[in-house]
């Protein structure tokens, strides 16, 4: 473990250590993105779905009953962090739009396009059930469900996303409600 004392002795800042860790993680543990079917079948072409043409991910997802995407690294060990490699969420968003993030384990993260319209409560229950039944305590991340908003580039808990959407919707309705209403003219103004 690297302590602040070691950083000071080595003359390395926390920011530099963080940046080096990000760069090295991507080199040593390259990103792997595949459909759930490909993952179950042993990771067929694990990087091709993401690295090649934009159509490849969409085409692969068309054949899926539930279009779940698995994000991990090539070793499939401690790969959940690969979702946080620079620009990964943004690139996924370009291909599939907004998406919900289901923390599967420390080894992978599941991504579900919002276009599927799965009820949030159902997803939360599913994550909690799978974690409780199939994921070892040491590999468990959380029972929370997260969301990535491609337009605003916001990663947040799904409950916060829903609240933010509701707030934005209410603001939009309030703004729409005042459109077209003319301000009363001053008493000294005349109209013909």
Task: List the predicted regions and their residue ranges.
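A contiguous, surface-oriented mixed alpha/beta subdomain in the mid-to-C-terminal portion of proteins
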Residues: 1-136
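Alpha-helical oligomerization segments
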Residues: 106-176
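Non-Sec secretion/translocation targeting segments of pathogen effectors
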Residues: 170-192
